[in-house]
Amino acid sequence: MISSRGNSLRGRSLGHNFGDACKSKWSVTRSTSKTDSRWILALLALGLSAVLLGCSGESDSTVRPAGDVLNTKSKPAGLPPAASQDEGPVYSVDAKHDIHNMLRSGMTTPVDPSDGGGKAWLVSEARINGTPGPLRAGEAGRLEFIYEAGPLGVAVDGEVHFQVSSFWQWDPPQNKDPESRGYTTVRTDADGVELTPVWHGTELLAIGIAGRSLEAGEQIHVTYGAGKFGAKVDIFAERGAEHWFSVDGDGDGLRKFIDAPATVDIISAPSAQLVVMVPTTLEPGEEFIAFVSILDKMGSTGTRFSGIVEFDAPDGIELPARVKFSGNEGGRQRVPGIARKAGVHRISATAISGKGQKLEYKATANPIIVEENIARVRWADIHGHSKLSDGTGTPDDYFTYAREVAGLDIVSLTDHDHWGIQFLDEHPEMWQLIRDTVKAHHRPGEFVTVLGYEWTSWLHGHRHVIYFEDEGEIYSALDPKYENPLQLWDALSGQPALTFAHHSAGGPVSTNWYYPPHSVLEPVTEISSVHGSSESHDSPSAIYNPVRGNFVRDLLNVGFRVGFIGSGDGHDGHPGLAHLGNDGGGGLAAIFTEELSREGTLEALRARRTYATNGARIWMQVSLDGHVMGTTMPPRTEADAATQTLKIRVVSEGPLKHVDIVRSGNISRFDLNGELDWSNERAIPRLERGEYQYIRVIEESGALAWSSPIFAN
């Protein structure tokens, strides 16, 4: 059964196919020990069916040498019929009806007053050798917790469940083998109470109550990692990592989570990499900040690096020769600089440890383009999660990382409306915390924070909703009033808000394009994230579980007009750098706006003055007869020439491999030889009515960027 009051139970995630890739948290309350684990097996079967639902998506596009397709014309097919409120329900091809129904039924499932009673806390933490904590990310150790029964106690045949996170490689709390990691013991000092722990191979341990009831105030001691190999903790550093206890107080097989989890702080692993982030666009004489961070191997901040960072700045960039780290800065510093001369500049840096064995980490910052009156590119990650749904870390840490480590200009935290342990749509205090944190970090002209959440529809695909003001409501996908896109857009009508479809071509669930993107509320779409690319099946990092015909290029081919952005959809607390902890890449949005404000960001997104990357800070300019990316050109007249001038310029982070020109589904390719700065200008046949054209950039490293299309009216 499903609970609506924070009484969810997360099942074991299913690798990179469904649970892990989606970073989902199952929301079930049936006590598995009562059903011989049939419930959890059903969830596993559901996850497997989700994998099998994916099919290979293909289109008719063929990559040809540059020049071949530049001289061809094609017209997109006619538009599909648009959805209306009067029509019957139409769902995504791979809609997860079982998940939707489980979540919905849990909103009305009654539980006994004794369910969810009690409290729990962390007693001690230690490394395997017995040294007291805190534990480092990815380290094995031992954690001891106490659960104390609430006023109504726990009856005979009732259960207390101990649960660790199903994400980031926490070891499951098993009681089968003391010689294996994750071994967990339970005990009580309550005379006459017998504890019967049962583990079903998931991230939770069910503790049955026998002999007599566990009375109010009586305790259960849980030692996680009691064996000699301990238990491995989160691979990402975070404050307040949550360990939940849920209680079936009357033994009826339904349980509820207690009001608050036991928490433990996980500190960063040892320093392993240097990251330097700088603005991409500056004018001569302009001051800037270089954000310099020494991170652990998974990208977590908080390292105690002690030493120096030396800079090799090119002529035209003024920076200190070196900065010193004492070990108390949390592994990060702001370093001021000045762009003295026009040009393309790349800053190199070396971090040298000052204690014991010397270690060196090298990095090259993203390129800086310095020009008079340059169009400003602002880097944004407007899709990510914290521990308030299915992510890692606090909202405050999320925004701090975005600015002080990733050097972002614009960021939004978009926790799920109804997915996790406690749900945003049922806990107004959590939504208030997010609103307060967004306000506290917002600094117009320096750092723009945007209020948001994720509309998590398992029937029509996931969208994040962001508000360009301090306040906004959660219109939950589980609420029948807002369960399809038309209802959501009706609720948002007239507000300074936007929606963004993401992982639209597959992954956890694809977007139901039967509801066309709203012309005002959804002008752009997210085509790259940790899930992969939804641009096209021929993208080098195409999304897993693809749905045929559901890629964004398929959408363009039938006449819809959307711009492109990327965003991380990170669940690791690292907005702007989600790709550091994910081999498949991440996502960033490049937004052209002179005014670094919520109003300027909203205007640029509505105008589609954007491009997408998979995490790299590639700079590009694209125009067609002076019309910039995202533009809809006016209708052709008899006086117009038969050709148009296409201008492309790319400045990359690493050696370039290809630049593709995508025209109405056809592709022409420039094969490159490792250039870092590439430009091209040529005449092409004029775009005909209904056509579109965009640019795809591919680096040798796998870094990608996509310009928003230019459309012919």
Residue ranges and their predicted role:
Residues R38-L48:
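Sec-dependent N-terminal signal peptides
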Residues A272-V276, M620:
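Proline-enriched interdomain boundary motifs that mark the N-terminal boundary
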Residues L103-M107, S114-E159, V278-T301, D390, ...:
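Extracellular/luminal Pro/Thr/Ser-rich low-complexity repeat and linker "mucin-like" segments
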